[in-house]
């Protein structure tokens, strides 16, 4: 009480040291934030900067040489095709249709829920990979055929660089990174994707490793050059999201596996988990029409279109739906016979065995426990996807029901295996040693351990070189003739002029296979067009659903094959066709007789006029109606084009892509140096 009684009162004006105004508080917060941000940075000395600059030069020099080697290898392997692409022709193969479409037609097909591949057109979601082709065509200034050729020959160097970036997440060894990139690029040769011009799988090869590389960089799980430290990056997350768009657009079935992978990443990643949830958003918007159609008409089996792509599926390549084991699915996808005594099959068996053992070894490495388990999640999800896809029917052909391709899932598995192989190499960070410390430490156990580690990396590099040779040998041996070529032919010039005169002009191309079988295609360009290839339309065929126009065309073609029929010609004219082009196929005498019979029947029918005849075929103009009235009904297309849902999708996708692109733009950094 006595102390309290003796207290005195002091005016606040005399205690100004204990008070802070708003400006002082703001200054304190700014300095505190600056201090906290500097704690995660490394201040580099001039010698350290010189060390990093030297490492950057070595690293990128090796990457450029690797890319040039890949480009030269593909150009040499397919030199006749590479030489012919400059003539203006279109690529084609056993699985890839040629194209004669303009850039405007490509944009319309890529953004409008209407497919002209069946009859005179049906409502169906656009094939997502056309968005990738549309962007590639911008690089070639609107030349669609040049864009296809560019994708084929640029895919190898870009896929090598893509995996080189992913390998840099796990190891800084330049040799292992370069050999890993070459091994990933040679995987496309082994599967025959270059020989087939399999555009969807080449797209996956280019973008899938890069997408995962930026995912790891986004959450700060990557190795850097000494003395830098890894850090999280929103910019890397945005780039990863953009890289996943072409992957999902090329092979929508990968979406199922990627969803599971991202859910598992949320469990293993320590920080920035919310950022991971935003990575799949742009890809989901890009394939939104396909997803909505698959869910809305799931009871009609339209979900099966997710297991198809823009290539033409065949029973010989995909097989029939069956409950296969993982080894059987891999053998079907690769054309590999595990129990065979053929040297190529034996070499691939040894290759897969060695890669699997190295991937299993990565699970017990103490410095890569979390990362190795993440990549094994990718392996397991890819294998599960391959098993599911081989059980799903997506269309029918002359040999029966065709199953979905197991190749996307197997490719995802191989990506995980090769990533685990890079993990085995260790960090391999070249430590920076100041000049005064060089040579000051005597030899120790640590130095001897370093020699053993380097020797192990040399052995690993030799194994990777052997694997590259095996994959290239197998691909060249097994995929000698996949029908890859450049189509410089097409419809006659007079026919092409008629088609180009109006977007609603059509010509029916027919080819007699036997006396009882006739093939037909509705032509709106000079070639049977790639942009009209639709997985959704093929699912409709698999379930026996066909529009009235398609049924009428099939009936009329069958009647003209059997005999002259003026009513059939009148029906085709009524549907809007301006002519019939009879294709001469094969040099066989019996085949020529069948083709001549079909041509004679068309000539003998009323309302036809022989306009031009070449070695490739004969064009007949339909003269029943006036030229101005010869056009298909585009009412359904105009409704789909003006649909509110289409406009909403395009606007939403554009806004989302613009936002992610702004975040992904490179920024100038004052401190530090991010390492590729």
Residue ranges and their predicted role:
Residues 68-120, 277-326, 506-512, 516-525:
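Aromatic-rich transmembrane-lumenal/periplasmic boundary elements in polytopic membrane proteins
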Residues 157-165, 169, 175-270, 276-291, ...:
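Membrane-embedded helix bundles of polyisoprenyl
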Residues 92, 190-202, 343-347, 371-450, ...:
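Membrane-helix boundary/interfacial segments in multi-pass membrane proteins
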Residues 1, 7, 33-80, 659-676:
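Start-transfer (signal-anchor) and selected internal transmembrane alpha helices
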């Amino acid at each position: 009480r006595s102390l309290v009684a003796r207290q005195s009162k002091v005016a606040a004006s005399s205690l100004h040291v204990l008070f802070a105004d708003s400006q002082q508080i703001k200054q304190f917060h700014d300095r505190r934030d600056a201090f906290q941000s500097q704690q995660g940075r490394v201040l580099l000395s001039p010698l350290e900067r010189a060390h990093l600059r030297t490492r950057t030069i070595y690293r990128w020099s090796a990457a450029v040489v690797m890319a040039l080697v890949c480009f030269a290898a593909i150009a040499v392997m397919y030199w006749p095709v590479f030489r012919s692409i400059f003539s203006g022709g279109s690529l084609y193969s056993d699985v890839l249709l040629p194209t004669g479409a303009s850039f405007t037609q490509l944009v319309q097909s890529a953004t409008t829920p209407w497919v002209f591949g069946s009859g005179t057109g049906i409502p169906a979601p656009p094939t997502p990979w056309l968005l990738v082709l549309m962007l590639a065509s911008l690089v070639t200034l609107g030349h669609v055929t040049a864009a296809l050729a560019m994708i084929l020959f640029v895919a190898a160097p870009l896929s090598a660089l893509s995996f080189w970036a992913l390998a840099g997440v796990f190891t800084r060894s330049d040799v292992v990174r370069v050999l890993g990139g070459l091994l990933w690029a040679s995987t496309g040769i082994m599967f025959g994707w270059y020989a087939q011009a399999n555009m969807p799988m080449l797209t996956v090869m280019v973008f899938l490793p890069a997408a995962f590389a930026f995912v790891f960089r986004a959450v700060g799980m990557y190795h850097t050059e000494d003395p830098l430290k890894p850090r999280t990056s929103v910019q890397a997350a945005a780039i990863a999201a953009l890289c996943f768009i072409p992957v999902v657009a090329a092979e929508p079935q990968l979406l199922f596996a990627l969803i599971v992978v991202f859910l598992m990443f949320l469990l293993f990643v320590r920080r920035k988990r919310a950022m991971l949830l935003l990575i799949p958003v742009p890809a989901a918007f890009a394939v939104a029409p396909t997803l909505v159609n698959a869910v809305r008409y799931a009871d009609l089996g339209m979900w099966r279109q997710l297991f198809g792509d823009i290539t033409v599926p065949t029973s010989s390549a995909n097989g029939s739906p069956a409950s296969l084991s993982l080894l059987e699915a891999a053998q079907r996808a690769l054309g590999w016979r595990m129990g065979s005594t053929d040297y190529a099959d034996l070499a691939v068996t040894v290759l897969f065995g060695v890669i699997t053992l190295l991937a299993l070894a990565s699970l017990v490495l103490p410095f890569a426990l979390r990362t190795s388990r993440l990549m094994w999640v990718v392996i397991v999800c890819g294998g599960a996807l391959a098993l599911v896809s081989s059980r799903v029917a997506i269309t029918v052909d002359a040999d029966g029901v065709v199953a979905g391709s197991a190749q996307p899932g197997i490719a995802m598995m191989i990506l995980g295996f090769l990533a685990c192989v890079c993990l085995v190499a260790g960090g391999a960070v070249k430590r920076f040693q100041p000049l005064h410390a060089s040579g000051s430490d005597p030899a120790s156990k640590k130095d001897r351990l370093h020699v053993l580690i380097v020797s192990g990396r040399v052995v690993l590099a030799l194994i990777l070189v052997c694997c590259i040779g095996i994959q290239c040998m197998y691909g060249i041996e097994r995929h000698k003739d996949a029908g890859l070529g450049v189509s410089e032919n097409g419809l006659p010039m007079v026919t092409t002029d008629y088609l180009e005169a109006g977007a609603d002009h059509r010509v029916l191309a027919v080819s007699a296979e036997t006396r009882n079988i006739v093939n037909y295609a509705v032509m709106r360009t000079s070639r049977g067009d790639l942009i009209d290839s639709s997985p959704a339309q093929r699912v409709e065929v698999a379930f026996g659903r066909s529009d009235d126009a398609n049924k009428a065309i099939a009936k009329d073609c069958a009647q003209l094959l059997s005999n002259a029929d003026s009513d059939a010609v009148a029906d085709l004219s009524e549907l809007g066709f301006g002519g019939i082009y009879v294709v001469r196929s094969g040099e066989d005498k019996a085949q020529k007789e069948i083709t001549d019979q079909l041509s004679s029947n068309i000539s003998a029918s009323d309302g036809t006029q022989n306009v031009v005849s070449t070695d490739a075929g004969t064009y007949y103009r339909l003269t029943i109606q006036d030229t101005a009235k010869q056009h298909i009904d585009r009412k359904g297309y105009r409704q789909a084009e003006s649909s509110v849902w289409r406009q909403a999708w395009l606007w939403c996708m554009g806004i989302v892509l613009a936002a992610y692109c702004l975040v992904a733009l490179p920024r100038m950094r004052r401190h530090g140096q991010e390492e590729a």
